[in-house]
Regions:
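Beta-strand-rich ligand- or partner-binding modules
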Residues: 22-442
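Bacterial N-terminal signal peptides
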Residues: 8-18
Length: 442
């Protein structure tokens, strides 16, 4: 009997084998003849134009303000937009959290326009600090700022001469917990802290290094004390100490300069609809390590640069699940459209200059966003070698995240294209049973 069952199973497998062999293996591709540009949701320091069909890091050229190489800035430390991920969007924020007021939130300080500026305010010096996050570490050696090209203070002082008396500049290569601490604490390294400055155009030089974060903080100076004394002699009340008089110093632009390639450049593709559920095989890519020598990029097998690729797949078009608070304080699932357009955030301010505070849960308020692991795989293990299997579940949607790494200012990697093996599912569902040939329907 057992031999009969074995024979039946062998015949069944033999009959199925031709169908398996006929499963067509194709590829899904990015790069080469399939453009990179326009297929991304995030790109930080990515050059789409240098070599057609390929991507590589943007090179920081001498004399070019690095701030101008970045776009899609936010003026909050913790942006409320859906999909924000730390390190995938540049930020500038004032004080502890930032705000949306364009007259003071710093947006005028990164617009490359010397006629726009943040007006001085009659508020404490302790609130006068800005933090700049370039999203990735870049090779930098100079931080600068300057006064506006025109205009006047309320007392008639030309803004062009309204220099900042005292300030501190500090820098840091990577993210840390310091940004969650309130107040103008210096970052990992202080590169300048003058106590008496009269220059309207300031340039602070330091040894070139990878820097992601810069913090500019206003400090008290004897020049401020002199202005306060002059104010008292003239019969006016108040001064820098009690915020009755606007602080000295007006800034029009921040500037950051350096030379070379960033430590990281990142690219996140859109979520791509493949049309039908697919099985996925190996990931292939072509990447070329290069070095910038005497004004030209030359191939350099020993370049300290490489590409790292992660992939995830899913069965619907959104890897997240969105929730709203109920009357009992619990959470219920809602659509992304309702979460994004109809619900309020869980944070608010009691005044324009106050920090954000957590509101009590209530209906109409955003609750958690969780990962839909039932329908989406997690990101694959980062792959740095072409031809390795992805080991991902089947899906009808795919997304790619690419990081172009470099640990030398002159070295970089160019990614020409990548492709993923895929094949359609042979059957949505297969049912069967083993039976003796003499009794095929027991």
């Amino acid at each position: 009997m057992l031999r009969t069952r074995s024979l039946a199973l062998t015949v069944a497998i033999a009959l199925l084998a031709p169908a398996v062999l006929k499963a067509e293996v194709t590829t899904w591709q990015l790069g080469g003849s399939q453009p990179w540009a326009g297929q991304d949701t995030v790109n930080i320091m990515i050059d789409f134009e240098r070599v057609p069909g390929a991507i590589q890091p943007v090179r920081v050229e001498p004399g070019v303000n690095i701030i101008s190489l970045l776009s899609n800035w936010t003026t909050f430390r913790q942006p409320k937009e859906l999909g924000y991920i730390n390190g995938e969007r540049p930020r500038i924020w004032k004080w502890n959290e930032g705000n949306g007021d364009p007259t003071e939130n710093g947006v005028a300080l990164i617009d490359a326009d010397s006629t726009t500026y943040n007006s001085s305010k009659a508020e404490g010096i302790g609130k006068q600090f800005f933090t700049i996050d370039l999203a990735v570490p870049v090779p930098a050696h100079t931080f600068g700022f300057h006064t506006p090209s025109g205009g006047f203070r309320s007392d008639g002082t030309p803004l062009r001469t309204d220099s900042t008396p005292a300030f501190q500049i500090s820098i840091q290569e990577e993210n840390s917990e310091i940004f969650a601490i309130k107040g103008p604490l210096p970052l990992a390294r202080i590169v300048a802290e003058p106590t008496q400055n009269f220059a309207p155009d300031v340039r602070i030089g330091f040894d070139q290094q990878y820097v992601r974060f810069f913090r500019w903080a206003r400090k008290f100076s004897i020049i401020d004390e002199t202005a306060l004394t002059r104010n008292r002699v003239s019969g006016s009340s108040g001064g820098q100490g009690n915020q009755a008089r606007s602080l000295l110093g007006t800034i029009s632009e921040f500037e950051i300069y350096g030379e070379g390639f960033p430590k990281r450049a990142t690219y996140r593709s859109k979520i791509i609809d493949l049309g039908a559920e697919q099985n996925f095989g190996r990931l292939f890519f072509t990447a070329t390590p290069l070095r910038f020598v005497d004004g030209e990029a030359v191939e350099a097998p020993d370049a300290r640069a490489f590409a790292e690729i992660e992939v995830r797949t899913g069965r619907d078009d959104d890897p997240n699940i969105y929730h709203e608070y109920t009357v009992t304080g619990k959470e219920k699932v809602v659509s992304r459209a309702r979460y994004e357009n109809d619900l309020r955030t869980g944070f608010g301010r009691t005044c324009a200059s106050c920090d954000f505070v957590q509101r009590s849960p209530r209906p109409g308020m955003r609750a958690a966003i969780t990962y839909d692991s039932d329908n989406w795989t997690f990101w694959s293990t980062p792959i740095t070698q072409s031809g390795l299997p992805l080991n991902l579940d089947s899906g009808s949607f795919i997304q790619v995240f690419i990081t172009l790494h470099s640990t030398r200012f002159a070295d970089f990697v160019r990614l020409d294209s990548l492709w993923v093996e895929r094949a359609p599912l042979l059957a949505a569902r297969v049912l069967g049973e083993v039976a003796p040939l003499a009794d095929p329907q027991p």
